[in-house]
Amino acid sequence: MTERSELYKKGLEMRKNLRSEAEFQKNASEYAEDPMSQEFIDVVTETVCGGLWSRPGLDVKTRTLICVVSDIATGRYPELEIHLRFALRQGWTEKELTETMFHMSGYVGVPLVREATFVARKVFAEVRAENE
């Protein structure tokens, strides 16, 4: 087995913190299906999760909201689905996330936020069902 850097180890812990155990295992098995995907998630784990998400200065909850906002502003809806789940897991409420989206409509435009609300509605329903 390859010896992993400290950043990789921090990043792996961060990835586990952001997802439920079931989501983490599903995600890990999807990336393990081929070498390119595995190498990609290893790079993301070390650089993004270990290097950025683990930095001091902002708590993880705030970082999840930054990701939600950046996904909406750039129209990255598949990533928005992931980051909304992270945000809910870190304690943001559906109401707070919805209000964030509404507020953004004045700055990034109604069409981007409209699409984001469709994603959010789906994610909110799935997470509520998973928690029942």
Give the predicted meaning of each segment.
Residues 77-96, 114-118, 123:
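Extended intrinsically disordered, low-complexity coil regions enriched in Ser, Thr, Gly, Ala
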Residues 42-45, 74-81:
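Short acidic alpha-helix initiation/capping motifs at coil-to-helix transition points
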Residues 1-60, 115-132:
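Acidic, glycine/proline-rich low-complexity segments that act as flexible tails and inter-domain linkers
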Residues 72, 90, 103-110:
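A short structural micro-motif
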Residues 63-71, 101:
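Short, structured motif recognition centered on aromatic/hydrophobic residues
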Residues 56-61, 91-97:
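Structural motif
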Residues 48, 100-103:
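Short, flexible domain-boundary/linker segments around small modular repeats
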